[in-house]
């Protein structure tokens, strides 16, 4: 750690780097995550190795890791393309073949957490989260978005797609760092404090 003031809140509260790294990994129970790891030919597929493959970088914050003695900078590790997005979202044969024959291996999909099949797509210089969703799942997300707007809340932008819902990266390419609510609440799931 070069500067404790720049640590993620998770590490300030928990001081467990391995747990923090594992929390940033793509959900291995997602079938498309397993296809992605196979296409990338990751030698080690555990959560920490998966995250280390992309220096623990994500779209929604500036936190990342650098090997000891390395001269890497954030500009070297931040993501600049969405080459593997279709494989992560759709998991179809064509997407797998394209990914498996690519020389590229850095992808924000390896740190795209959550249980739904999803991906990051770069559109006109902006990152969008595309998430597979049923009609009811789309309705609930769009309803919450519209309700929040009507109540005057500052909401992440959501749009309906065909078989998916998409949301504009509300961090604006990590101009602010997203910290999950669990970081603040810790084990206080009843919100009593």
Each PLM stretch: what is its role?
Residues 1-193:
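Phosphate/dinucleotide-binding and metal-coordinating scaffold of catalytic cores
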């Amino acid at each position: 750690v070069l500067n404790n003031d720049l640590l993620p809140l998770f590490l300030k509260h928990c001081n467990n780097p391995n747990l923090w790294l594992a929390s940033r990994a793509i959900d291995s129970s997602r079938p498309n995550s397993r296809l992605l790891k196979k296409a990338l030919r990751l030698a080690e597929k555990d959560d920490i190795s998966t995250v280390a493959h992309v220096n623990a970088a994500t779209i929604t914050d500036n936190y990342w890791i650098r090997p000891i003695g390395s001269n890497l900078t954030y500009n070297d590790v931040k993501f600049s393309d969405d080459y593997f997005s279709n494989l992560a979202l759709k998991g179809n044969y064509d997407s797998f073949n394209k990914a498996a024959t690519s020389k590229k291996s850095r992808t924000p999909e390896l740190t795209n957490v959550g249980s739904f099949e999803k991906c990051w797509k770069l559109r006109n210089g902006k990152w969008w989260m595309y998430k597979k969703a049923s009609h009811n799942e789309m309705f609930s997300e769009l309803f919450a978005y519209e309700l929040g707007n009507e109540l005057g809340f500052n909401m992440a932008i959501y749009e309906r797609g065909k078989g998916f819902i998409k949301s504009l990266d509300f961090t604006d390419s990590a101009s602010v760092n997203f910290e999950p609510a669990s970081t603040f609440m810790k084990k206080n799931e009843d919100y009593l404090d």
